[in-house]
Amino acid sequence: MKTLGRVNGIISNIVIAKVDGAVAQNEICYVYCGETRMMAEVIKVMGDEAYVQVYDSTRGLKIGDKVEFEGHMLEATLAPGLLSRNYDGLQNDLEKMEGLFINRGSITDPIDFDATWEFKPLAKVGDKVSAGAWLGEVKEQWVMHKIMVPFIMQGNYTVKSIVAAGTYKVTDTIAVVTDSDNNEYNLTMVQKWPVKQAIRCYTEKPRPSRVMETGVRAIDTFNPLAEGGTGFIPGPFGAGKTVLQHAISKQADADVIIIVACGERANEVVEIFAEFPELVDPRTGHKLMERTIIICNTSNMPVAAREASVYTGMTIGEYYRSMGLKVLVMADSTSRWAQALREMSNRLEELPGQDAFPMDLSAVISNFYSRAGLVKLNNGATGSVTFLGTVSPAGGNLKEPVTESTKKAARCFYALSQSRADSKRYPAIDPLDSYSKYLEYPEVREYLDEHIEKNWVDAVYEGKTIVQRGKEANDQINILGDDGVPVEYHERFWKSELLDSVILQQDAFDSIDANCPIERQKMMYNMVLGICRNSYDLADFEECSKFFKELIYLFRQMNYSEWKSEQFDGFKLKIENLVNEKLEK
């Protein structure tokens, strides 16, 4: 029997309910406002009172209204049919909702329970299985979707029967398993899992050792993101966070992409809805939307559901990781999620931390980021969840609590600089403030030595030194004037400008330059480094700037040319001739 309660107090979207039985922290309940049934979550229990956070507007709610407790936490539905769907933060399918605006209390099925799937068994009668073991597979879009023993089942089981290959609904029984006491369990293709708990059906979680290719030079070459790693992109408004995330989601070397639009403007999400069904994935030749799930909680949707949306996205990511797939989860922006936590904490009158954020903000963010990672499954296969979040610090202040807390948890830091954005140097990733701690991992160094070239990390650090020395030279030139410093200072500055213009800047709206494969990045980077290592016979700063501007122009044309085309090779030859003319004899 369900536990019931009555509304005893209302503080904006927090409702205090008087309860007639036991309720648990994070339990889901429904608050009734007339005929409307609104989902809510228990966030605090004190004696016979439960503080519940309502995922909708509480307008019209009054003292004495009914509250019904469900006895379980907020759960995600995991089954074939998730790919290419658009959800809200509570996994309601947005396509099934009617009307221009989302009505209060709207709840829709996350998947089509009547759809049929071509099932192919992988397990046999008599096999010993445990939670997360693969029983069979169905083809979802072009991904082989594994049907697994529900994660909630503990201990070992024996397969008593499994259906033959054929067409089935997700709700049909596809296998029967027995436990050690001979109790039978009917298994279907659908299972549920609480979003706030990590799925831990794996044997080990090794450190990331492979690099995830994104096609963005400033990331892949300078600060690589590891497969199963974590990164975040802080930056002020208008610095290009969303465009950079969209570029990565289009080009990343991943099997499944999950985009969580958490409190962002609705028009940015509409862009994804409009673009992704049209775009083709160059790796597979399929539409990008076929490997993408969008969880959309825009800024005009209930604030409380923002927190749920990031957890729902991560849970779906962990589900696909358990199939041995590479998953990329992107949240834009985690600052809005932190603001939802702050609002909740303030309404509960908890002790505030810095900037009124909750005291445990750092622990909450670290706990969430730790759910990403590379895992070794029970059957020996590997899967990964790579997480990339954006942070929108107020006024571009990178010392505020959300950025500081995220910095402790994430291994890659891609700081977007307002000055680079203002001077149209996109992507505006600051080459000196940004870092990737994966460059320090021996496993990643080995991988880069093997897959790109020997001593690649040393070459990356050399490039960073060139940029640093160029900045110092520029400061001197600005103070003393063009004539007040030796030509070597100008040369040093222009070498850093060359590296910046050719490697760090990229056109996300050009069909060729938007996606730069690793092989091409290696060739271009080595070419630029080779030029930067040489000394040139330049009489004065005017000749120096003319020479390097010409080089930058030719390299830019190369970036816009098809890889290894006649045009590309032509520009390469022109660069070599120009450099040979000016080399110091």
Q: What is the predicted function of each stretch?
A:
Residues 221-222, 228-551, 564:
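P-loop NTPase catalytic core
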Residues 54, 59, 118-128, 159-167:
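Short histidine-centered loop motifs in beta-beta connectors
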Residues 1-103:
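N-terminal accessory targeting/assembly segments
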Residues 99-133, 137-142, 146-152, 169-229, ...:
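P-loop NTPase nucleotide-binding/switch module
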Residues 43-49, 80-91, 142-166, 184-199:
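Short, compositionally biased
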Residues 539-585:
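C-terminal amphipathic alpha-helical interaction region
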Residues 15-16, 38-39, 50, 60-61, ...:
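Short beta-strands and strand-coil junctions in structured, solvent-facing domains, enriched
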Residues 19, 33, 70-71, 90, ...:
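Conserved "cap/hinge" positions at secondary-structure junctions
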